[in-house]
Amino acid sequence: MGAALGTGTRLAPWPGRACGALPRWTPTAPAQGCHSKPGPARPVPLKKRGYDVTRNPHLNKGMAFTLEERLQLGIHGLIPPCFLSQDVQLLRIMRYYERQQSDLDKYIILMTLQDRNEKLFYRVLTSDVEKFMPIVYTPTVGLACQHYGLTFRRPRGLFITIHDKGHLATMLNSWPEDNIKAVVVTDGERILGLGDLGCYGMGIPVGKLALYTACGGVNPQQCLPVLLDVGTNNEELLRDPLYIGLKHQRVHGKAYDDLLDEFMQAVTDKFGINCLIQFEDFANANAFRLLNKYRNKYCMFNDDIQGTASVAVAGILAALRITKNKLSNHVFVFQGAGEAAMGIAHLLVMALEKEGVPKAEATRKIWMVDSKGLIVKGRSHLNHEKEMFAQDHPEVNSLEEVVRLVKPTAIIGVAAIAGAFTEQILRDMASFHERPIIFALSNPTSKAECTAEKCYRVTEGRGIFASGSPFKSVTLEDGKTFIPGQGNNAYVFPGVALGVIAGGIRHIPDEIFLLTAEQIAQEVSEQHLSQGRLYPPLSTIRDVSLRIAIKVLDYAYKHNLASYYPEPKDKEAFVRSLVYTPDYDSFTLDSYTWPKEAMNVQTV
């Protein structure tokens, strides 16, 4: 722990500083980002021995165990007689990884490593976040979820079913860790843009929490992935003999709501009222109402609504430095009116209000197109969210017509309709404005509204492009090269989570997501903008997440949202002291000796 924080930084000891969870860092060391070179590993006492050590991914070091550790832990002979540093272990993994032909095979290798040696897994991820993020999360995680029956190797996370209702507290007691600080939960009904994958959706919470640690430094032993299995309406899965979930239609209504209510209460009863619960990939009908139902009662947020909103608004704020005007000068057309679209729209309204625009005027700057066309006043069966953005305008059937009529400065695709941004739409956008904003945010890549290459080619390099999934750099005929910005939620949720955990925040207001968007936009340099980037390089994401966490923590104390007191004087030092390190611990016994005269053997 950082000495500058001292004893009594809190009224009670910080919960969950498990052995091996802290980086070897001191506040007096020179600032070197999130990855200052660690000092010697301190000995960590273990009660486990033998196979209980080598088969525990939190403890296993493979051939990095020293001879002394092997002898003391009773594992000598259970490991080959070879001694490797973590650097060499990383090299072995990388060489094997590079031999794989498919991304799915690479995903399986990494997940198998996570099940075997957790520290090495995170050493691999943090060695090149930009390289490995598309494998452990979008777009490859979508493919892994579709084939989860084949890729499933070892249970990771907690599977809770509708038939366990009334016994969720008992099920949570089955989890081996008691000091959980973050839960990511899904019911598998709307996995990315792939639809209802039921129990196969567990790949999403597992992947998200891997990024909590790799990008945000949250201790993985304090994270819990949860799949709520209430059935699936995917007939293909119901017929599949390899499907690992409940084989019946989805349960809705009161029984579903009762399960969610019990789950939320059981989590907070077990892990505390400030345990963070992130909702992920719930269907639109449930996502909004559950967010509104729980947001002021529990420490929770919905990443598809609020996380996506934050990263999208961050990209828009960065784009303003290219268009050289204010947010209030822009008009937005959305392809899609689901969770992501509504989340972005609401945060845009908040940003416009902060700029001084009245709310009614701000909503008129946002036009939404769903499967039935432009959302207009008087249209039947509009839900509350859509009514807020319904325009006083005659009905318009297609996105192309809406773009032609409205002449927006920005189009944002979040409907998972591949190719929705046609060449005609892109040409129109380029004719209306010198620097049109074009965000194709749908995941995975196969569902993107347009490719980066198509956007830059049709707009002759004038389009300001961002996507939800990664695209390679694009070089036009004139030799100009663009590096597309990826609006990945991983810029948001790891840093927000670290800040929320650090402050013991009990409720997460939308202001935190606007603050996060502003911080991400500030991280983009002029050089990045000249390359077409609207987001900082993924290689810097751990440092970005750290600064977001510090901002969140500072905001929490200023607005009386934090529950841990006294307030840390040096918030950066405090947050850094919580960051997980993949460096191995030492498991040798604490050995020392007494003065010789004190050990004289008494005789008769």
UniProtKB/Swiss-Prot annotation:
InterPro entries: Aminoacid_DH-like_N_sf, Malic_enzyme_CS, Malic_N_dom, Malic_N_dom_sf, Malic_NAD-bd, Malic_OxRdtase, NAD(P)-bd_dom_sf
Cofactor info, note text: Divalent metal cations. Prefers magnesium or manganese.
Catalytic reaction equation(s): (S)-malate + NADP(+) = pyruvate + CO2 + NADPH; oxaloacetate + H(+) = pyruvate + CO2
PROSITE patterns (alphabetical): MALIC_ENZYMES
Residues forming the catalytic site: Y137, K208
Record-listed Phosphoserine modification sites: S371
Entry-linked SUPFAM superfamilies: Aminoacid dehydrogenase-like, N-terminal domain, NAD(P)-binding Rossmann-fold domains
UniProt KW ATP-binding keyword: no
EC number, UniProt record: 1.1.1.40
Keywords attached to this entry: Metal-binding, Mitochondrion, NADP, Oxidoreductase, Phosphoprotein, Transit peptide
GO CC aspect terms: mitochondrial matrix; mitochondrion
Binding residue positions for a divalent metal cation: E280, D281, D304
Family note: Belongs to the malic enzymes family.
PANTHER family: MALIC ENZYME-RELATED, NADP-DEPENDENT MALIC ENZYME, MITOCHONDRIAL
NCBIfam families according to UniProt: PRK13529.1
Entry function: Catalyzes the oxidative decarboxylation of (S)-malate to pyruvate using NADP(+) as a cofactor. Can also reverse the decarboxylation reaction, but only with significantly lower efficiency.
Name of the protein in question: NADP-dependent malic enzyme, mitochondrial
Annotated organism of origin: Homo sapiens
